[in-house]
Amino acid sequence: SINDFTVPKLFELGMAAKAENRLSSCVVYAWAMNRFLRPAPYLQYIDEQKYIKFIKTSFSEMNSKFQFPFNIGDIKIIGFQIETTDNEGLIPIVLYLTEFDLNDPELDKKARQAKDKILKKFHGLDHDFEYLLMRAYNEMPSDPKKKYNVHGTVIKLKD
């Protein structure tokens, strides 16, 4: 579990997000469900098939709605990921390409300025999560064997 969120609780949150048209949040919960669905090889939730169907449907809807890459203003969005932390729980991550030097302090400013446009496209994230991470790359991270330079900007979603 993550921050005491079990798979049944994540399913409940995901269904609520889906019912309120917050697909991006729904996918975050589905991702977490997928990660924790089988806590051990011999353990299985009674409703596992229902959870698997929800996970697959959520991912499929996300993939059909968001044809990566796409532009939001002058930011080229290349992907969407999720990470977990012990303190903050689930953190949605928007991956994007930039021509700026990854050490340029303006990068954080530009990412924060794009917050409203990002949240409009990824509707619901500000309703369900405390933070959003914007992860910038100078080139498409397409080779799994290659190490890429990256710059992250944490955006607080709730005051």
Predicted feature residues:
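Hydrophobic beta-strand segments of well-ordered beta-sheets in folded domains
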Residues: 27, 91-96, 128-134
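Extended alpha-helical scaffolding regions
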Residues: 98-101, 109-132
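Short glycine-rich, basic-tinged beta-strand/loop micro-motifs
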Residues: 86-105
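Short beta-strand edge/turn micro-motifs at domain boundaries
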Residues: 1-4, 120-149, 159
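Alpha-helical protein-protein interaction scaffolds
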Residues: 3-62
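Surface-exposed, polar helix/loop patches in the mature regions of secreted/periplasmic/lumenal proteins
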Residues: 1-5, 79-87
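Alpha-helical linker/edge segments of TPR/alpha-solenoid repeat scaffolds
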Residues: 51-81
